[in-house]
């Protein structure tokens, strides 16, 4: 089985394509099937989120492009920027992942959230689309110009460490 574990900034050729919904692109360990039918194992450092268009190199040197799968979502539009901002506020208040587009929000399909958004005056339509939510306040995703563009997948600190009583003081 092909193992994908190195992220590249660019590649001269693509040897395969792996189409994944968002919930699988945020997993650090994953077994999946490429478009060709070949099984692959994806190993990333915990906290890494694969984005549409990311390129991974396999243990045998092959290059695989990640494509965001179309999945059931809601497209949220409003009559004014203020109204859309209110919708974004209430979604964030519920810790709901949201994609921010030009004049719209996109969220995963959820009937309760749809009812809330419609109650705020938003137009909510079902849409089969790639879901690319914001990475959050602690998300990374930047790179430094001048690097060689080849690096093992590294963690993106999406969440702060939660200290539990059982954690030993250092």
Swiss-Prot record:
Quote the subcellular location field of this record.
Answer: Cytoplasm
Entry-linked SUPFAM superfamilies:
Urease metallochaperone UreE, C-terminal domain, Urease metallochaperone UreE, N-terminal domain
A single Gene Ontology CC annotation of this entry is: cytoplasm
Which Gene3D superfamilies has this protein been placed in?
A: Urease metallochaperone UreE, N-terminal domain (2.60.260.20), UreE, C-terminal domain (3.30.70.790)
- SMART domains per the UniProt record, alphabetical: UreE_N (SM00988)
**Record carries keyword Chaperone:** yes
For this UniProt record, the keywords arranged alphabetically read as follows: Chaperone, Cytoplasm, Nickel, Nickel insertion
Task: Specify the domain of life of the species encoding this protein.
Answer: Bacteria
Q: Which Pfam families match?
A: UreE_C, UreE_N
According to the record, the residues making up region (Disordered) are 134-170
Q: What Gene Ontology terms for biological process does this UniProt record contain? A: protein folding; protein-containing complex assembly; urea metabolic process
CDD domains this protein is in? Answer: UreE
Q: Which GO terms describe its molecular function?
A: nickel cation binding; unfolded protein binding
Please report which protein family the annotation says this sequence is part of: Belongs to the UreE family.
Q: What does this protein do?
A: Involved in urease metallocenter assembly. Binds nickel. Probably functions as a nickel donor during metallocenter assembly.
Q: What name appears for this protein in its UniProt entry?
A: Urease accessory protein UreE
Natural source organism: Janthinobacterium sp. (strain Marseille) (Minibacterium massiliensis)
Per the record, the gene is ureE
